[in-house]
From Swiss-Prot:
<dbReference type="InterPro" id="IPR000740">
    <property type="entry name" value="GrpE"/>
</dbReference>
<dbReference type="InterPro" id="IPR009012">
    <property type="entry name" value="GrpE_head"/>
</dbReference>
<dbReference type="GO" id="GO:0005737">
    <property type="term" value="C:cytoplasm"/>
</dbReference>
<keyword id="KW-0346">Stress response</keyword>
<dbReference type="GO" id="GO:0051087">
    <property type="term" value="F:protein-folding chaperone binding"/>
</dbReference>
<dbReference type="InterPro" id="IPR013805">
    <property type="entry name" value="GrpE_coiled_coil"/>
</dbReference>
<keyword id="KW-0143">Chaperone</keyword>
<protein>
    <recommendedName>
        <fullName>Protein GrpE</fullName>
    </recommendedName>
</protein>
<dbReference type="GO" id="GO:0000774">
    <property type="term" value="F:adenyl-nucleotide exchange factor activity"/>
</dbReference>
<dbReference type="GO" id="GO:0006457">
    <property type="term" value="P:protein folding"/>
</dbReference>
<comment type="similarity">
    <text>Belongs to the GrpE family.</text>
</comment>
<dbReference type="Pfam" id="PF01025">
    <property type="entry name" value="GrpE"/>
</dbReference>
<dbReference type="GO" id="GO:0051082">
    <property type="term" value="F:unfolded protein binding"/>
</dbReference>
<dbReference type="GO" id="GO:0042803">
    <property type="term" value="F:protein homodimerization activity"/>
</dbReference>
<feature type="compositionally biased region" description="Basic and acidic residues">
    <location>
        <begin position="30"/>
        <end position="42"/>
    </location>
</feature>
<comment type="function">
    <text>Participates actively in the response to hyperosmotic and heat shock by preventing the aggregation of stress-denatured proteins, in association with DnaK and GrpE. It is the nucleotide exchange factor for DnaK and may function as a thermosensor. Unfolded proteins bind initially to DnaJ; upon interaction with the DnaJ-bound protein, DnaK hydrolyzes its bound ATP, resulting in the formation of a stable complex. GrpE releases ADP from DnaK; ATP binding to DnaK triggers the release of the substrate protein, thus completing the reaction cycle.</text>
</comment>
<feature type="region of interest" description="Disordered">
    <location>
        <begin position="1"/>
        <end position="42"/>
    </location>
</feature>
Length: 178
């Protein structure tokens, strides 16, 4: 009877063999396809890593350029801070009574040349007239305000302030009406 069943269904045997072959082909194609997918994923991963590294390098270069520009822009800051007391001393010397005209003229020339050199580097005096601004002025004393002098205005300047571009080197020391 077993032979009879095989003879009756030779088509079933062929169909089963074809199904086995198709399954084997699918299994053999699956690893190839997954290897291809893995290779594509790795390629995408490497591309992403490359793009990130490239962007990071551009950011590093941009930051280095900005830092170099900042250093260039504020290179004279330390020198200016060292020279400002000399300018203050020249102003005090010019305020002394009894100087001969020649000495006074010589001191004024030195003062003007120093101020000119500072201006060429972007260093300028902070205006100390009008309203008090805590960003540029340091109140060291207050005096009562009156009708002629409203509150929060500058009464007197004890020491001039200076700035380098937008950076304060030294705030102006002032007396403020309160």
């Amino acid at each position: 009877m077993a032979k009879h069943k095989q003879e009756e269904h030779p088509e079933d045997v062929e169909v089963k063999e074809e199904a086995v072959e198709t399954a084997e082909q699918a299994e053999s194609a699956s690893p190839e396809k997954s290897e291809l997918e893995l290779a594509n994923e790795r390629a995408e991963d490497f591309e992403n890593k490359y793009l990130r590294a490239h962007a990071e390098m551009q950011n590093i270069q941009r930051r280095a350029n900005e830092e170099r520009q900042q250093l260039q822009r504020y290179r004279s800051q330390d020198l200016a801070k060292a020279i400002l007391p000399s300018i203050d001393n020249l102003e005090r010397a010019l305020a002394v009574e009894g100087l001969t005209d020649d000495v006074k003229k010589g001191l004024e020339m030195v003062q003007e040349s120093l101020i000119h050199a500072l201006k060429e580097e972007g260093i300028e005096e902070i205006p100390a007239d009008g309203a008090f601004d805590h960003n540029y002025h340091m109140a060291i004393q207050t005096v009562p305000a009156d009708d002629e002098h409203p509150a929060d205005t500058i009464a007197q300047v004890f020491q001039k302030g200076y700035k380098l571009h937008d950076r304060i080197l030294r705030p102006a020391m002032v007396v403020v009406y309160n």
